[in-house]
Amino acid sequence: MNIARAQCAASSLTPETRGDAFRKKGQVEQAIEAYLEGVAAPPSAALCLKLARCYEQMANYAEACRWALSIVDAGDDFTSWQAGWALFQRNAQKARRPAVRSVKVALLGSYTTTQLCPMLCLAAGKLGIHIDLYESRYGQYQQDILDHKSGLYAFNPNIVVLAVHEGDLHLPEYSQRPEEDVRKEVSRWTGLWQMVTEHSRARIVQHNFALPCEIPTGHLTTRLSGSRYMMTQAVNTRLGEAAANAVSLVDCERLSALIGK
């Protein structure tokens, strides 16, 4: 009876659970077989990571890299992306994995960009692109750009990413002269673009500004051209016009509407 119960319990386990049990016992090959049984299209990020770790244990570095990169198509769980990038870095050189191309990226932000770095590198790795990354210090994007002797220009990047957010706009909560304030703010950003192009050959990629959800005047805000909310919309529009083909804009306002703010 106990044997029958045990067999019944074993048969009810999912492939991933069986794989976990095998891996815990050190039976890595059996764990891989079980995990592969549970692979869906696309597999979960957790399962991709487990397979990558198993292949790393078996010194199959190429497969470890392949499954680490598969995390990109498996969801947006940050911890999985972070672990996947660390695992990929450990195994890529051992696997002698060739990169289709290599690019030097300078990441400048008005917020902490530490979490963005591994996600950016892993996503690029999935496309066969190796990123040599320069990360500016927290909130130092303007200082880096204005100082022609800064680490930014010494790095000589191919791409400069301006990862900035709405809180860094130099706009009041309400303005009696909204057109002038918008013009000044747009001029500040386009001036930074000009400095980058004067001191480097880098392509600029800038995040535009996601509008805040909670605003003091609520629905009335759209009737107030001098409100920060409406001025931010105007800045986004004007930056889009000014960018033309010279600067690539990431529409964070649209993305936040899709994903959440």
PLM segments and residue spans:
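Boundary/linker segments of alpha-helical solenoid repeat arrays
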Residues: 43-48, 73-85
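A short, compositionally biased domain-edge/stem linker segment
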Residues: 85-96
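Short helix/loop capping segments that flank catalytic or ligand/cofactor-binding pockets
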Residues: 115-117
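Short hydrophobic segments within beta-strands
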Residues: 107-108, 207
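Alpha-helical cap/lid subdomain in secreted, periplasmic
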Residues: 6, 10-11, 17-20, 37-44, ...
